[in-house]
Amino acid sequence: MDALYTQKILALVAKIDRIGQLDAPDARASGVSKLCGSKVCVDMNMRDGIVTDFAHEIEACALGQASSAIMAREIIGATSDELRIVARDMRRMLKENGYPPQNSDRGGNWSELSLLESVRDYKNRHASTLLTFDAVEDCLVQLGV
């Protein structure tokens, strides 16, 4: 279990940006892990298929907070396709022994999600780690992009 809570993961938890809610989000979605009760709620604005603003409220374990911290740092400027690819790669990394997400062509530093690769061996932690991705994808569906 100590392998999960590395200093790098704890450093992410200590600096989570974009906490709160947007005044007038284009989409809002939340997710709850049935296993541990972790909860994430995200607000998102998009213009011309690109994320222009984002905020989130997080009541989650360190792993859910760490993935949310990376999401908040990298999401502005991302396209719906980029976000779907990152979410797909995260699921593959955790559930199918896949490779971690890679940096995007526009410069999104998604490769830092590799810090969560050790979660793969703890299936009971997958849901909380993926909450932010699930909520963002729900927002994309709401926006029809």
Roles of regions detected by a PLM:
Residues 15, 19-58:
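Structured beta-strand/loop patches that form or line metal/cofactor-binding pockets in enzymes
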Residues 59-65:
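Short, thiol/selenol-centered motifs that function as redox-active sites or metal-ligating centers
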Residues 67-79:
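Alpha-helical support elements that line or immediately flank enzyme active sites
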Residues 1-19, 78-145:
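C-terminal binding/interaction regions
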Residues 35, 69, 103-104:
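Proteins with a high burden of low-complexity, intrinsically disordered sequence enriched in S/T/G/P/A and R
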Residues 40-41, 49, 72-73, 82-85, ...:
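Short, surface-exposed, polar/charged, turn-prone segments marking secondary-structure boundaries
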Residues 36, 63, 124-125:
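Secondary-structure capping and boundary motifs in well-ordered enzyme cores
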